[in-house]
UniProtKB/Swiss-Prot annotation:
Pfam families the UniProt entry points to: Thioredoxin (PF00085)
Keyword set, alphabetical order: Disulfide bond, Endoplasmic reticulum, Membrane, Redox-active center, Signal, Transmembrane, Transmembrane helix
Annotated domain remarks: The di-lysine motif confers endoplasmic reticulum localization for type I membrane proteins.
Source organism per UniProt: Theileria parva (East coast fever infection agent)
Any GO molecular function: protein-disulfide reductase activity
Disulphide bonds in the chain: 64-67
Ranges of the Lumenal topological domain: 20-181
GO BP annotation list: response to endoplasmic reticulum stress
Cellular-component GO terms for this entry: endoplasmic reticulum lumen; endoplasmic reticulum membrane
Stretches assigned to the Thioredoxin domain: 20-141
Entry coiled-coil feature ranges: none
Entry superkingdom: Eukaryota
Record-given protein name: Thioredoxin domain-containing protein
Amino acid sequence: MKFLILNCLILFSLISSEATNVKLDREDQNHLVLLNEKNFEKLTQASTGATTGTWFVKFYAPWCSHCRKMAPAWESLAKALKGQVNVADVDVTRNLNLGKRFQIRGYPTLLLFHKGKMYQYEGGERTVEKLSEFALGDFKNAVGAPVPQPLSLFALVSDFVVSGVNEALRVYDAALAGFVTISSFSFLFGLLVGLMLSLFLFTRRATRKPKVLTERKKDK
């Protein structure tokens, strides 16, 4: 009985140790921070104090080929800057409000947040070396902009209403254009059919008159 209990304890210790090692390995491999609408401000404190350090954030879309191309360099950058600069990702297609807040117009957009200001990386090369130089000091040569506040409930509702109105107008314009096109086609088609029918009747009458005259001459 004691032997069985001892074996169980040893087995449990081995499993716990293995699970801990796997967890540590995964944490060590995962250097990128995944940000979303729920945790962005809490983790970055971009507009509320910036006590969590400097953040270098990539705003991307899954379908963007340039984003996929630079992914290995971005992951290497996160590993190289660990403990100095927080490197993170934001999938804008799943976090539309963050895209609106920071006015993301293209992918990838790289923004560095430092002490209440944000700096956009506009360098042509997206190598680990160039990105690292920017994150560790070269960003100061760029023009910084104040970090916009999180979108308020009023702003979200207003944007929803405006988007709804714009979509309704787009549908109306498309429907109106379709109606005009179909109406014009129907009118022209009807006109063409009418002309063909009139021509057919006129031709038929013209061919029947001589026959009637011929029959009358025979009667005389």
